[in-house]
């Protein structure tokens, strides 16, 4: 069983007091191709492409120009670097070495630049969303550039797991990069809803955090069987069998 999560736009590169070796992303060669294309762009090109302000464009331009493929094994792990709602829910800062190692086996972070990241892959500062409309070496966009590579990498990692199930906690933007995977293996998609009057509705900010909390729950409880995630109960959520349908598992809270 492997869970999938989207990356965050914000990165914190402050080194933690942690004695654990980081790894090099498996698609570093592909990332280099993408970055070489981005390095040719000026700030005035990046801002409309990435839909960012000029100030953020300057920062992004600097990150792109500074990016390289040199790894020393002491970089900050991506799972600790990403800072967004999902990663606030995951809250990996208090993970033990054993937690991080389990998470490294059971989670893959989808990425526009790196394809698929392991949690303990070393961080290089970057900003590139999967949905960015950029042509790389003749491809229509990043989805076209990556093709089936990300899916095949996840499936290969899944071979080492007893239960061949994907827990899809990624956003549609990122899951789209491997959407054909449900033809190969079972994909369970948890959905998190809040009570609003007499109905339950998805509230995006809470749903993002809950996705990270689900990864935390899987990690802390060493869950390897998908059925066990139905016991997820962080922050008042509980599995709602009535609203769930097929492999779309709904978790609600009042």
UniProtKB/Swiss-Prot annotation:
Q: Which residues form a coiled coil?
A: none
Cross-referenced Pfam families: H2O2_YaaD (PF03883)
List GO terms (cellular component aspect). Answer: cytosol
Q: Which GO terms describe its biological process?
A: response to hydroperoxide
Sequence similarity: Belongs to the UPF0246 family.
HAMAP family under this entry? UPF0246 (MF_00652)
Could you tell me which NCBIfam families the record lists for this protein? Answer: PRK02101.1-3
Q: What is this protein called?
A: UPF0246 protein CPE2152
Query: What organism does this protein naturally occur in?
Result: Clostridium perfringens (strain 13 / Type A)
